[in-house]
A protein has these predicted regions:
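Short, small-residue-biased leader/transition segments that mark boundaries at the very start
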Residues: 1-5
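A motif-centric signal for short, conserved binding hotspots located
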Residues: 6-167
Length: 167
């Protein structure tokens, strides 16, 4: 796998780069990493600072940890175990995503704008040698998509017969 990582990417540029073995921030917009059931693109964590473009920044989840008083004890189910452990907070800073973990704005592939989802990461690199994310930023809730879609999902995507062999 180490040799594979050193090869040139098949499409675009790498979204994850290391400097002295530690993840570094990107200066280019993340590529499309997938498509949601509603047909909208899912990008990596880096996008334009403003919905109209500008410099590239790591986009932020609008969710924060909010442990409820009636949840099971954290000694049994650790903090952030349940979806209910998170609350979405409205924010006027355009680097924060909406409750669906997306926003409307321009991207390299959609210069006129598109609603898109973004993968979200913690803002700091993990420094714990026992952690599988050591020297990397951990994924951050809701990771890819929030509670709802930004557009109407295609019903075909929910059928059991819809798989890669059918396309």
């Amino acid at each position: 796998l180490g040799d594979v990582y050193k090869r040139q990417p098949l499409y675009g540029s790498r979204d994850l780069t290391l400097s002295s073995g530690v993840e570094e921030n990107k200066t280019q917009h993340s590529p499309i990493i997938g498509w949601a059931y509603d047909g909208l693109p899912i990008y990596g964590p880096y996008g334009y600072e403003k919905s109209t473009g500008g410099s590239v920044t790591q986009l932020n989840s609008g969710y924060s940890v909010d442990l409820k008083t009636n949840r099971p004890p954290t000694s049994v189910f650790p903090q952030e175990f349940f979806i209910e452990d998170f609350t979405w907070n409205s924010n006027t800073d355009e680097s924060y995503l909406d409750e669906n973990n997306g926003r409307y704005g321009v991207t390299p592939e959609y210069p006129n704008g598109v609603y898109a989802y973004f993968a979200t990461l913690e803002s700091t690199v993990t420094s714990d040698s026992s952690d599988p994310f050591n020297n990397f930023k951990k994924p951050k809730f809701p990771y890819l998509l929030g509670e709802n879609f930004g557009a109407q999902p295609n019903e075909f995507n929910f059928l059991s017969k819809s798989n890669q062999d059918e396309i």
